[in-house]
Amino acid sequence: MSVKTFKRTLAAMALMAASVMSSSAWADDLQQIRDRGVLRHIGVPYANFVSYIEQGEVETLTGLDVEIVKGFAKSLGVKYQYVPAQWSDMVGKLTGQDVQYHNKQAVVGESVPIEGDLIANGVTILDWRSEVLDFSQDYFPSGVWLVSRTDSTLSPIKPSGSVDEDVKTVKQLIHGREVLALEHSCLDPNLYDLYDTGAKVILPDGARLLNEMVPAIMKNDAESTLLDVADTLIALEKWPGEIKVIGPVSENQKMAVAFRKNSP
């Protein structure tokens, strides 16, 4: 998929996503939202779905999912409120229960305040997330790829026609190689058994956004990085000739809006 196609697809998905928001997935919550007078949108800055910049008293908020949720709030006759989140706390802000992915399973932790009504920022549907969240109909395709600098000796694989076989090939290539990853997100190395490949998995110090992964390898923090489809296409346009896609690390994935499990 080219960058132009990606952008056209984003626009086309807006209409579909709008219908997702009005689905029966959270019918009972709608009355509560109307009574409260505000729709609370939990979002993590990511690709063209949510862009959030806070500089003192000035906030800049844009993105596909932002416009969709704002439009839905308007249709309900309520105000729109953005609730900033990180990958590690977005589930808790929605469900009121801290949940982390650990040892290949969802681990439920302490109770936390509920701060929002839905999560919309191109959330990847993962098995562990489906255990604690309900998802709308998917509205955008995704997947995780291995991306490296062009000066890396890693070479893009030749597609075999089978995603599973391509994933195996890529995993064989990264034995002993540096791979940047990001826990609690769709780039969590534990989701793809990356430690079993013999790769030198590098995790960032402190918080990092998905769109900071490529700049990190450009600064030689690692030779390569895991990167989802949406951010990869944006990065290829932003750094033409400086990065290359080696191949897939995951099966095909899908994105959707997330709701609380107790929403019918």
Regions from the PLM with identified roles:
Residues 72, 94-97, 173, 213-218, ...:
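Hydrophobic residues within well-ordered alpha-helices
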Residues 45, 139-148, 153-155, 210-211, ...:
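Periplasmic-binding protein-like
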Residues 88-92, 106-131, 189-194, 215-251:
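A ligand-binding cleft/hinge motif common to bilobed small-molecule-binding domains
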Residues 21-27:
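Sec/Tat signal peptide C-region and signal peptidase I cleavage site
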Residues 2-13:
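Bacterial N-terminal signal peptides that target proteins for export
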Residues 28-122, 204-206:
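Extracytoplasmic small-molecule ligand-binding "clamshell" domains
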Residues 11-21:
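Hydrophobic helical h-region of N-terminal Sec-dependent signal peptides
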Residues 78, 86, 123-187:
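A conserved helix-loop-strand patch within extracytoplasmic ligand-binding domains
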